[in-house]
Every structure is written in structure tokens, then in C-alpha cells.
Amino acid sequence: MTFSSAADFQDEFDVIVVGAGHSGCEAALACARLGCRTLLLTLNLDKIAWQPCNPAVGGPAKSQLTHEVDALGGEIGKMADRTYLQKRVLNASRGPAVWALRAQTDKREYAAVMKGIVETQANLVIREAMATDLILGANEQVLGVETYFGTCFAAKAVILTTGTFLGGKIWIGGKSMAAGRAGEFAAVGLTETLNRLGFETGRLKTGTPARVDKRSVDYSRMEPQPPDDEVRWFSFDPEVWIEREQMNCHLTRTTAATHQLIRDNLHLSPIYGGFIDSKGPRYCPSIEDKIVRFADKESHQIFIEPEGRDIPELYIQGFSTGLPENVQLAMLRTLPGLENCVMLRAAYAVEYDYLPATQCYPTLMTKKIEGLFCAGQINGTTGYEEAAAQGLVAGINAARFALGKELIVFPREESYLGTLVDDLCTKDLREPYRMLTSRSEYRLVLRSDNADQRLTPLGREIGLIDNRRWQLFQSKQANIIAEKERLHETRIKERDQVAIAIVKDTEQKIKGSLSLADLLRRPSLHYLDLDRYGLGNPDINLAEREGVEIEIKYSGYLKRQQNQIDQISRHSNRHLSPDIDYMKIETLSMESREKLTKIKPATIGQASRIGGVNPADINALLVYLEMRQMSAVKS
């Protein structure tokens, strides 16, 4: 690291963001929109917000994150709505807590549109450079960064959003090269700086499948996966809702020949050949991992997805591998429909450095260096949506730090975004982290449809929601409240013609009279049915109708979960001072003392989720806090 006395600054900023992927773009835009002069450093100005793996946004839990980022004033949801090739709602037959919108996006259009947004954003400067060193003050606080060629930039806060580029190395078979992703060089120097400053770093692995030429594929041998007829939106802002022609994806499957070919060549893969031992993503395994871990499965689904409207490349989802190129091509040609395929890009594995996020506060500022924030894959996550969510959190807090304002913690009970950050900062994760609906204990109340209700008021308070968005939000909430009141107050009598028709269709009796709200609570009846019987409200839109139906139909469950949240939060949100010396609290087990000392949780709730800290330790900690408070009062 360089100290300020040795630095000759070329320019001064409030915040510097290192890396212009999905995390870096959200962070930089948030900082600039909050009034901070911001510098966004990238290794390649032509690869801003690139989608190096699957060009898609959303899916289970990831769609909730995307809606939440949008509700706070972020960009990823708008980007997906502007550039989609296909949209589908996954899990539509199940409850609203797990509904998941997914968009296949146009890879090049996505990057071009985002590049235009960051280039025209006020307060935001973009520069092509590799940051290799941090410039620190006398108290080891951040003062700026130094690039590979020795240029120094000053800043009050720095956000590291380095993706897979820190010490990146790509592998195909037993051969490797230094690269953050294929065709782009790795970032050097920064890992060594972090190590010198006392940070723990580790290695993780991910991978991407081959791309094939769509002109060499026989679609008649595959099952079409059409888009939904009714287009849904990630953003709560109708200004970015662009209706456009959609494209099919396709489904094929692995065969016995595929599996045999993989088994015969396992020794040539980077992992099974022993060339690398970094942990890969559990929920996005390579095809080799699938064949080994699920040896009893005769076949695996493979989705064939377009990467753009005007390019020939197809993404082979579910077929990532690190096997040699000649083996890859032979494997691809065992898939029905791909017997004569032409491979345009080979699949590869990539390993990279990361910084376990237990070294960060839930604000994503590091505990060791004041003013240094980390977001995205450097924190051990995988996925564009996880990266974007962290980028927004880090951007908001870096801006507030630079402006001398109090930093914000997003509680896990109020958002998936909060759950994500809490897990990262609390749990000792040693494999790439992916957001899942099962990771949230509060998923009934943390739905996509109410992300704006939960987070837009906070986005407004922070300063990321403008007057137009705020008026849209207030109008929607007022319409939902008014419609719920109407449904509770409007009753139908058993002798009414409409009631007789409903009884006949549903085979459920109406005794005396029934409110429309009680009618809507029936499992088999939906708001669309109210419309059919002339009982709906034509003045409210689809999102408002869904919000009304969910809140009425699931009101009992939602109330119960909200009560649980309120009960837990009484103790969970109790603050733990960073100066507590846990090693001196003898009523704690030694393991919990060590874990608490290492992680320094911000709240009792965070402490309770640390592995090795049991309920008895939490009780002892609560007693300690009471005694500490009493002695403070006495003194």
C-alpha cells in the first residue's frame, strides 16, 4: 500500500469504484445520483456490464433481488426490461412467495445500453485503468487508489467490485492462462495489497459453457420453450416497459453417450485432474460434477438459449465444463439437435481471488480499513443479481460515508437484499454463494410484488427515488388500500343472480351474504374471476390486482409471519458495540468467543446466526449487555 505523503494525485473524487460489472455499475450510479463525484475504473471500456456467462436476469430468489434493487432506485431491473429476448414466470403454479420472473437478455444490447447510461450520468467519470494499490492515510483510512502505471486518484471512499478478475486464471483441460474471463487480462497487485493490510483472501472457481452457432442446430429435435403470452416487468417504473418481439428457447437432454464420454475423460478436467482445488458453485455445477454427483440419473436437462437477436451464438445452459476443447465438441454432438453443431467459443473454468465477507460490516465497509467497501464476487457470491444488490448497498453506504452521513444496514427480515448481506457478513462461506428462496425465513412477506411497498420509502429517504417515481408508488399503494376496502365492504347475497352463478361454477355455497374479500379468500377463486362476474374494478392495473389478491388471500399467513418478525426483532436488532472484548466474557463458550471476536457482529440477531454460537451463548451475551448497561448508568 502507498501512504498519502508519497502520492501525487491526478484528480480527486468522493468515491472510486474499481470494476464496471453489474456490481460496479450499480455502485457507481448510486454514488453519482446521491451527489458524489464518482470515478468508475474498468479494465475495458467496451465490456461495461458484460454478461460473460448466461445472458439472463431473474429466476428463483434472483428476481426478488432484482425487484428490490429497482424498488430502491437501482438499474438492473430496468436493464432487463429494456433488453429482454424472452420472459417467463417460473413456479407460476405455486404460491406467490416463490413466483420468479426470468428474462433472457440480449447480451450486446444490455452492455451497450448500460454503457450509455453510465457515460451520461451526471457526477460520474469513467476511466480505463487497472487499480493495483490502495493509498492510505496515517490512520490507515482510504485516501485513494494507484493504477498499474502509477497514476493516483484521491477519494474519501473506495468500492472494490472486481468480479472474477482478481488473480483470475482460466482453465481448459490441463492448460491455463491468466485472465479474468476469456480474452481479457487478469487484475494483478490488488490481492497482494489486501494481504499486506492483513485481509484474508481465498480462491473460488466458476465456469461457463460453450457457445454454438445457431445455424448449425436442428431445432426440430428439441422441445420449444416459448415465452409467456403476458409480459411481466422487473421494474416498478412503466417508463421502461418496452413491448418487443420475443424469441423461443429450446430444451434438449444429455444422453448415455454424453455421460460415457464425460466419465472416460474425467481425468482431463481441471478439478478431477487435480489441476485446481478451488470450490465451485454448488447450485450451478459443471456437467462433470452432475455426472459424478448424480450417477444414478440417466439424463440431465440442457437449455439452448439465444445470446442476442442479431448474433449467431447460442448459450448451452447446464453444460458448463473445463474439459479439453476436442472433448467438449464431441460431448456437444451427443445432444439431440446438436449432432452437427459448430462450436464458436469453448467452455472454460475460471478461478479467482475473493475476500471472505465476514471481514465486512453489514454496510459492506471493511472492518480493517475505514472507507473501503467490497461488493459482488469479491465477497464470494455468484450471479449478476447478487452482485447488483451488493453494489447498490455498497454504493449507498460509500456515498453516505463520503458525505459524513450515518451508514445504512438492511435487516434480513425486510428484504432478500438484507438476507444476502447478512449471510455474507455472518457465515463463514467457503464456496460461491447463490441466493435461494430457502435462505430467507421470511419469504412469505418478502415477495416480488411488494418489494416497492417494503423498500421504496427507504429509497426515497436515501435520495434515489425521484418525484415521478414517488408519485407512481403513492398512487399504486392508495389504489391497493382503496380496493381492499371496497372488497371488504361489498357483499353479495345468496339469492343474487351473480351469487347463484358463482355457487354453480365453484360448487361452494354462499350462506346469507358474503363479502367479496371472503369470496377472494377461497383457494379456487381469483381476481380474474371477480372480473368475469362483473365484480372487479376496471380502474386498477394488473400489479394492483395481484397485490390486492395476495394480501387478502394470504392475510392469515402474512399476519402470522409479521408477528414472528416483530417478536424476533425485539432482541435481534439490539446493537453490539465493536469495542466489546468477547474473550473477557467468561460465560461464553471458547468457540463462541473466538467466532464473535473474528466476525464482530453488529447485532444480537447477527451473532445468533454465526456458526458455533449457540442459544446459551446468546443468553449469556444478553445478560452481559444488561450488566454493562447497569454499570454505565451507575457510573
Swiss-Prot record:
Sequence positions that bind NAD(+): 280-294
Cofactor: FAD
Residues annotated to bind FAD: 19-24
Subcellular location(s) of the protein: Cytoplasm
Keywords (A to Z) from UniProt: Cytoplasm, FAD, Flavoprotein, NAD, tRNA processing
GO cellular component entries: cytoplasm
GO MF annotations in UniProt: flavin adenine dinucleotide binding
InterPro entries named among the record's database cross-references: FAD/NAD-bd_sf, GIDA_C_N, MnmG, MnmG-rel, MnmG-rel_CS, MnmG_C, MnmG_C_subdom, MnmG_C_subdom_sf
SUPFAM superfamilies per record: FAD/NAD(P)-binding domain (SSF51905)
GO biological process, one term: tRNA wobble uridine modification
Role according to the record: NAD-binding protein involved in the addition of a carboxymethylaminomethyl (cmnm) group at the wobble position (U34) of certain tRNAs, forming tRNA-cmnm(5)s(2)U34.
Similarity comment text for this entry: Belongs to the MnmG family.
Subunit structure: Homodimer. Heterotetramer of two MnmE and two MnmG subunits.
Protein name: tRNA uridine 5-carboxymethylaminomethyl modification enzyme MnmG
Organism: Microcystis aeruginosa (strain NIES-843 / IAM M-2473)
